[in-house]
Amino acid sequence: TDFDLSQHAKYSKKKIQYFDNDLNEEGKPIGNYTPFVVETSVGLDRLFLTVISLAYQEEKWTKEDGSEDSRVVMKIPAKIAPTKLAILPLLKKDGLPEIATQSMNECKSHFHCFYEEKDAIGKRYRRMDAIGTPFCVTIDHQTKEDNTVTIRYRDTMKQERIALSEVKDIVAKACC
């Protein structure tokens, strides 16, 4: 609109108009007018707000037993998610935290990881969904037997068994 220039002209007591010699449909000069101004603005805060607004989702579904469930998930694209991977030992005992810590140490020099052993695994998955972590790896008793882990994908909630040695490459390929 011409609001900014009109207000500036009003308070500065100077004319800020454009004279146009072109002719209108009636054959008369268009004359003086205050031009409209298009103000574009791009800033990091607006970009960040846009990403967060688009990423925030509340999902609802019906479980197999017929009950309703829901979750809050930040579907931040994996490449810009602040935390790429959560490493979650199933229990705080039986050597699982030690394996998880070792895996954490292997991955943390390549991307930001988060380690958590508090609460049930389902609650930990939900917390990671809410902060936008695209991958969760669960270290369980089977990990001790065959060196595989369960990887969970945030967007689909799909889980699969993979070799512990593949975790870093899978996450790096998706995120970096």
Stretch-by-stretch model annotation:
Residues 1-176:
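NTP/phosphate- and nucleic-acid-binding module
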